[in-house]
Each structure stands twice: as structure tokens, then as C-alpha cells.
Amino acid sequence: VYVVMKALNHLPMWENKKENISIFASLHTKNPHAFDKNTFAYYLLMHGIVYFLKVDFPKTNLEQNEILYRAGLYQDGISNYCSVARLQAFNENNQPHLGWAGFYDSYEALNVNMDNLLHIHFITCCNRVYIVENPSVFQALLKKIKKEEIEKIGLVCTNGQLNYSAYL
């Protein structure tokens, strides 16, 4: 309990930062798995976070991830990704992100993970965004958009299920 209380005092949100929850756990408990979901320490940590944020205890996995993110914590930043196309991203200085701009201009897909999204201030698009879960459908739509040079449609592919990177 003491370790969790100490960790709560060092949540990244206190410094307006973001950190991987495994790294956070390792720094404060010497165990990267200390705050894995379904552990007692995670349960205590989550209760402390909801207390500080003045929100109800989360009922779903998505709600848990949202609360963790508000506290400055996120799950695995690399494997938590989605694919996007024809979306423009802007950095913390409200400047176009050059990597995203290149994929946008060439009508190509970009796999975006949580670590990538940490440096994005906002994302803009055209008139519509189609969100699909199937990569083959995503690829077919992108080919059609590219072939016909349709500029007013953006795409997001969740690759089977909605993870937190797609939600953001």
C-alpha cells in the first residue's frame, strides 16, 4: 500500500507528462508488472487516480485506459496502434507533422502507435472519416481513394478491435 501511495504522488499528470505504465511501475516499485491489470496494486492505483480526478471507478477496459491516460499513464506504446490515411496531424507547436504530411500527400497508409500520438496536438481531416476494422477493406478503400484522387475522405483502420490509439 505504501508503494502505491508513493507512486500516486509521482503520477505523470502532476507534471503534465505521459509515461508508459510499465516504466512507471518499474521506477516506483522495481517491478514493471506491479501495476498490471487485475493485480491488487493496479486496483489500489486506479482507486487513487479516480479519487484525484474526481470520477467514478471505470467499468470497462476503455474507461480504464482513458482514466490512466488522464493520469499520464498509458499501456504499451508500440503494439497499441491503428492505421490511418489522409489525416493531417499537427505537433505541440501547431505545425504540420512532416511524417504524417508525407503519407497524406502520397495517399499512403501510416501505422500510428501510442508513442507517435504523444507528440500530436490535434488531427484534422476533410469532410468525412471512414472507420473500418478490417485491414483488407481499409486497403481497398485507400486504393480507390488514391486512384480517383478523392481528397475529402480520411480513413482509420482499427485492425480488428478498437484499441486506445484508435480511440484517441
Q: Which stretches of residues belong to each language-model region?
A:
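Nucleic-acid enzyme cleavage-core boundary/entry regions
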Residues: 1-157, 162-167
